[in-house]
């Protein structure tokens, strides 16, 4: 059968389930897909199909992730669910599955548990902008006061990690009842309430093409009689012929003008997010630009050397290091298109980092990189990946 054409009539939003092991993330994922498929069309998913998440690779790291799609009246959602805690850590840090918002699943019977806290912290560190809470297994709790207590605990935990705990939507329900076809308040009604919260609480994300222009430099050529051409894939925004741009990172920032946009050897008036292009730069010498820099809208992004990051260090089985590393470890940090050496400062209570750990670190690079919070990077030793990370906070 021919693949059906993807009709994009509704805005698209990426979400995912997070929370403690056995609190019902996968059951809820199945329940959402099943209830919404019956209401708005789409494919219902069984628990087993989601639980048997296929392996995929992101930045050389193997992650098990299940991808489920569903629709509401207003939107199309792509939803990720991971079977194991380690998969969540890797997924969130590598940005393999970018989330515009997360559904935190918390069992009403147990309340917040260690991974509940850890996933909220991770969401904060990697820049997941919105969290909605699904208080699951409410059918197992008869005491209304107990429910209220759990809700309060969850709100406090969210506030502790700088999410708006008091204003976060909390939906009470039972994913199991909903999946079994229960039409009551805790069943189907709760899922519809959750869908409504997704639609109203998570804003429609900005499309890449609407962002400010940014293109990582992949290659630089000099074409006699025309000048210097820089090639790369436009990450976001639009570049028009005649616009002023900046070259940022590694060396002092310089301004130049884009005098031509080429794609597949054709001249264009403009290039936009997703295009692989060559940009002709006025008065720029070939030796003035190098891989690892970015071209961007003037003033939109600054070069930095000092930042905190959340990192996952590959285990030995994943092809990572066989031994721990200590304070002042100096690997290469691969940002976008190039490696820059940097030194790692560990948190005070952490003497060493073992392969397979995730940890918050402070990094000082030997050369500045065009950087924003949320930027992903790989940690490498002699060209092989030993870790993955995300910029949590820029220090200077």
UniProtKB/Swiss-Prot annotation:
SUPFAM superfamilies in alphabetical order: EF-Tu/eEF-1alpha/eIF2-gamma C-terminal domain, P-loop containing nucleoside triphosphate hydrolases, Translation proteins
The keyword ATP-binding appears for this protein: no
Keywords: Cytoplasm, Elongation factor, GTP-binding, Hydrolase, Magnesium, Metal-binding, Nucleotide-binding, Protein biosynthesis
Pfam families (UniProt xref): GTP_EFTU, GTP_EFTU_D2, GTP_EFTU_D3
Broad EC category: hydrolase
GO cellular component: cytoplasm
E.C. code: 3.6.5.3
UniProt xrefs under CDD domains: EF_Tu, EFTU_II, EFTU_III
GO molecular function ontology, one term from the record: guanosine tetraphosphate binding
Region (G5): 174-176
Region (G4): 136-139
Region (G3): 81-84
Signal sequence interval, chain numbering: none
G2: region residues: 60-64
Domain tr-type G: 10-206
Highest rank taxon of the organism: Bacteria
Residue span of region G1: 19-26
Residues that hold GTP according to the record: 19-26, 81-85, 136-139
Catalytic activity: GTP + H2O = GDP + phosphate + H(+)
HAMAP family: EF_Tu_B (MF_00118_B)
Assembly and interaction partners: Monomer.
Family to which this protein belongs: Belongs to the TRAFAC class translation factor GTPase superfamily. Classic translation factor GTPase family. EF-Tu/EF-1A subfamily.
Protein name according to UniProt: Elongation factor Tu
């Amino acid at each position: 059968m021919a693949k059906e054409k993807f009709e994009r009539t509704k805005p698209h939003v990426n979400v995912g389930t997070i929370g403690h092991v056995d609190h019902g993330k996968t059951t809820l994922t199945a329940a959402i897909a099943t209830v919404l498929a019956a209401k708005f069309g789409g494919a219902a998913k069984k628990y087993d199909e989601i639980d048997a998440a296929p392996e995929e690779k992101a930045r050389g790291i193997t992650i098990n992730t299940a991808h489920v799609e569903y629709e509401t009246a207003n939107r199309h959602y792509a939803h990720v669910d991971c079977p194991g805690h380690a998969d969540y850590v890797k997924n969130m840090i590598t940005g393999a599955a970018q989330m515009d918002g997360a559904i935190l699943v918390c069992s009403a019977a147990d309340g917040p548990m260690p991974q509940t806290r850890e996933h909220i912290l991770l969401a904060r560190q990697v820049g997941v902008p919105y969290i909605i809470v699904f208080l699951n297994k409410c059918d197992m709790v008869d005491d209304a006061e107990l429910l209220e207590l759990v809700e309060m605990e969850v709100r406090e935990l969210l506030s502790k990690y700088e999410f708006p705990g008091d204003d976060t939507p909390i939906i009470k329900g039972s994913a199991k009842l909903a999946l079994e076809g229960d039409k009551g308040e805790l069943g189907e009604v709760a899922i519809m309430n959750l869908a409504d919260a997704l639609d109203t609480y998570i804003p429609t994300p900005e499309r890449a093409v609407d962002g400010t222009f940014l293109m990582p430099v992949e290659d630089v050529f000099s074409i006699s009689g025309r000048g210097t051409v820089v090639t790369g894939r436009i990450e976001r925004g639009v570049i028009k012929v005649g616009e002023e741009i900046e070259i940022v990172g590694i060396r002092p920032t310089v301004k130049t003008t884009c005098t031509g946009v080429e794609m597949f050897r054709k001249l264009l008036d403009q290039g936009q997010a997703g295009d692989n292009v060559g940009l002709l730069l006025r008065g720029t010498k070939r030796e003035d630009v190098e891989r690892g820099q970015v071209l961007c809208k003037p003033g939109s992004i600054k070069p930095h050397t000092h930042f905190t990051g959340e990192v996952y260090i590959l285990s030995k089985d994943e092809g990572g290091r066989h031994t721990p590393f200590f304070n002042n470890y100096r690997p290469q940090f691969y940002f976008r298109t190039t490696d820059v050496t940097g030194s790692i400062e560990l948190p005070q209570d952490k003497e060493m980092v073992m392969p397979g750990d995730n940890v918050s670190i402070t990094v000082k690079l030997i050369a500045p990189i065009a950087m924003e919070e949320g930027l992903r990077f790989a940690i490498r030793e002699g060209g092989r990946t030993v870790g993955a990370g995300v910029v949590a906070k820029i220090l200077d």
